[in-house]
Amino acid sequence: MRLLVTGGAGFIGTNFVHSAVREHPDDAVTVLDALTYAGRRESLADVEDAIRLVQGDITDAELVSQLVAESDAVVHFAAESHVDNALDNPEPFLHTNVIGTFTILEAVRRHGVRLHHISTDEVYGDLELDDRARFTESTPYNPSSPYSATKAGADMLVRAWVRSYGVRATISNCSNNYGPYQHVEKFIPRQITNVLTGRRPKLYGAGANVRDWIHVDDHNSAVRRILDRGRIGRTYLISSEGERDNLTVLRTLLRLMDRDPDDFDHVTDRVGHDLRYAIDPSTLYDELCWAPKHTDFEEGLRTTIDWYRDNESWWRPLKDATEARYQERGQ
């Protein structure tokens, strides 16, 4: 298969490209990435001889059309994704997440190419901490941040292009990912690299917020299953049913790194911080016979810690600037 992977130098996209090269050696993979601060050429160094990397913006209609015309399918990861950055400046999120997705949709419509669009559970808003309900495919959208609002808008565009123009597209909404190649601005790698650089870990507020954690390799195996077997027009929710509050995650991480589990600082909470995310993935499990493999969270966290220990040259150039931005916000 000739695959075009947008955002393939970012966290989840990089891991998808690595798995495609490893598990589907007959795929011809082209990566389109703007190589911004969160998309790094170094993340693809191990597979650079097996792929084609094109540096470019997904709002560049001419470039996108050319690359889509050469492809059998597009897996659309490219997005601005860090909520704190969206709160500071939402404009890049509108540009990439909405206009970029529109540009991709017009190209796949023009050339009749299959599309899978990657989205987030944050489009559904949040759940109460004491409410055992979970998000399903029929949960109404209720985004609460500029980031999630732009992703919700992108999802709606995909659905409209499927219905109005017959575009062959699927959507997946996934829970919080962790694993290798994740930028140090994100919760888990920030804490790991804080410990590794002698800084104190930081926890927003009381740490009661609950996230539904999934290893990035499980997310990407589900994406591949949907790409290969998913029903056109369908939305699939991806989760390994790994709900944990942030305080528990941080204490587990510190214990695995041989640190006092209470050796961290509480910092100013994020504005409008969503309380709880939880996904019901039963449609994906039942319809496409998919199941996660990385169900032992501690083991997944341990291997992630080991990756950051072993790959300091990858994250060290990012660390000081990231912490400086957090310090400006009192976080």
Curated annotation (Swiss-Prot):
GO biological process: dTDP-rhamnose biosynthetic process; polysaccharide biosynthetic process
Keywords: Lyase, NAD
Cofactors (names): NAD(+)
Metabolic or biological pathway, per its Swiss-Prot or TrEMBL entry: Carbohydrate biosynthesis; dTDP-L-rhamnose biosynthesis
Residues engaged in binding substrate: 81, 120, 176, 186-191, 202-204, 211, 246, 269-273
Entry-linked InterPro entries: dTDP_Gluc_deHydtase, NAD(P)-bd_dom, NAD(P)-bd_dom_sf
UniProt similarity note: Belongs to the NAD(P)-dependent epimerase/dehydratase family. dTDP-glucose dehydratase subfamily.
An annotated Gene Ontology molecular function: NADH binding
Cofactor note: Binds 1 NAD(+) per subunit.
Organism of derivation: Mycobacterium tuberculosis (strain ATCC 25618 / H37Rv)
Enzyme class, broadest EC rank: lyase
Residues annotated as the enzyme's active site: 121-122, 147
Domain of life: Bacteria
A single GO cellular-component term on record: peptidoglycan-based cell wall
Record's protein name: dTDP-glucose 4,6-dehydratase
Gene3D superfamilies: NAD(P)-binding Rossmann-like Domain, UDP-galactose 4-epimerase, domain 1
